[in-house]
Amino acid sequence: MFNFKCVFYFIPSTGHCVPPARSGHRCVADSNNLYVFGGYNPDFEEAGGSENEDYPLFRELWRFHFATATWQLVRTEGYMPTELASMSAVLHGNNLLVFGGTGIPFGENNGNDVHVCNVHYKRWNLLNCRGKKPNKIYGQAMVIINGYLYVFGGTTGYLYSTDLHRLDLTTREWTHLKPNNAPSDLPEERYRHELAHDGQRIYILGGGTSWTSYPLDKIHAYNLETNYWEDIVTKPHEKIGYPAARRCHSCVQVKDEVFICGGYNGEVILSDLWKINLQTFQWTKLPAVMPEPAYFHCATVTPAGCMYVHGGVVNMSGNRRTGSLYKVWLVVPSLLEMTWEKLLKTFPYLAQLSTLQLLNLGLTHTLIQRLK
C-alpha cells in the first residue's frame, strides 16, 4: 500500500562520482534524468582543488539518473558557457537553454547570449540571435510560452533591472517589450526572483536586491494580451498568513499550481514549501520542510510531479554550501509511478538486465527507456 506524504526525502547516491557542494547553479529534469549546470563554491578543497580549472566556478553539466540513483559528469562537445552563476535555464524538448549569468568577480563578466545544449546528443551551440538583446545580466528569470522565451529582471552587479525581453525561438529575434504602464506602475527592479505563467500572464514571485526582499502577498503579473503589468492580490493561508518575503528561492510549476521553496529573507535562511493556485491566488503552506534551510539552491519538477532540490548555501556565518539532493512529491503519484518506485526499490539491479530480459519480465519499451 502506498501512503502518500508531502515530505522531503534525502536521495543517497549509489556511485562514487557526485557533484561537489555548490550554489548559484540551475537544474532541469525530464522523465529519466535531472541535469545540473554550473555553480559556485569559494571553498578551494570542496570545489575540486587544483583539478578545477574554473575555480571557484563549476564549468560542468551533471546528470542524475533517477532509475539507478547515479550521477554522471556529462562529456559534451561545443562551447560551454563561462557565465556559471545565477544564469537562467529551461528545458525545451531535448534542448537545455541557458541565458545570462555571471563569472568571477560577480558582475564583472556577465553574459547575454543564449547557449543551447542538446542533452540527447550532448552538444553545445550558441544561438545566433538578432534584435534588441537584454543587457549582460545575472539573477534574471525566464519562461517559455508558445514558442517565445521571456526574460525579466536581473542585475549587472551594480544596477537592478525591471526590463522584460522576448525572444522568438523560431526567428531568433529579440524584442524589448515596452509595457503600457506609467513608469511608477512597473514592478520594482530585482534579481533572484522566479517566474510562473498561465499562458496569458507571467507572474513574478519574490526576488529583491542585495538589501531587500520583496513580499508575496501581492504579485506583479504581465498580461501578454494587453501589454500591461497588473497587481494581483493573493489570499493568505488561514491562520498562517502569507509566505515570508524572499529572494534566491526556487520555484516549480505543475499545471495551475506554483510551488516555492527555501530562499533568504534578509535575516534567516528559509526551509518552507508553499504553493499558490493561479486560478484562485490562494496560498497554501505545505507540511513538507526542507531538511536543511537553503538559498541559492536549485529545484525542478519531473513531468510526473516530483520536485528535486539540489545544493545551495545552508549556513551564512560559515558561508557553507551543500551538495545534498532531495525529492518531494508535489502531487499524488500516478499508479504507474508508485509501482515503478516500488519495483526499483525491490529490484535495484534491474538496469543491469538486457532489453530482452526486461521485455520477458513484462516491462514496456517506455519503462525500459527509463532504465537506460
How would you name each of these model-derived features?
Residues 108, 114-224:
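Solenoidal tandem-repeat scaffolds enriched in leucines and small polar residues
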Residues 16, 30-54, 76, 92-110, ...:
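Glycine-centered tight turns/hairpins at beta-strand boundaries that repeat
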Residues 2-14, 69-75, 122-129, 171-182, ...:
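Trp- and S/T/G-rich repeat-edge/linker motifs of beta-rich repeat architectures
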